[in-house]
Amino acid sequence: MKDTYKLILGIDPGKGGGLAVYNEKENETKAIKFMDDLCELSAVVGSIIHGFKADEIYVIIEHVHSFPTDSRPSAFSFGRNLGQWEGILASYELGKETVAPKTWQNHYDVPIIKNKYERKRWLKEIAQTMFPDIRVTLNICDALLIANYAKEMQYYKKNEKKGRKK
């Protein structure tokens, strides 16, 4: 019987973001920060896809957008980073789902924190608790939590389909 398993890629597409990969077969998660060199980043994604030979690759990327208070260069940077990720994923014929920041953060009961730095520190602490074997940084904490969110949501969906006893 063939051993089937899934990879989950969680992506924080911000310039200071990262990529987390959950390997269902090994029950292991790894993460890297976003690289400035797109060729290198694309090669890393390719090595993940071709190296693991998973039966299914599920990609979830944070749905980012600019705010009216953002400067034009900042808004452009948001769109460019997301577009770069979309291009890399498309080059490997990978579809994606998006998740709003509020959606995945609510999964971890993150309070509403207006200050971005304080919110990132809060998220980093959650990720450090969940992934004690990983050196969690501000760059990769969101990606780790997004990948874990996707893993947990798929677990819940799978069990709902089977039907739970009440």
Q: Across the structure, where does each feature detected by a protein language model lie?
A:
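Phosphate- and other anionic-substrate recognition elements at nucleic-acid/protein interfaces
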Residues: 1-166
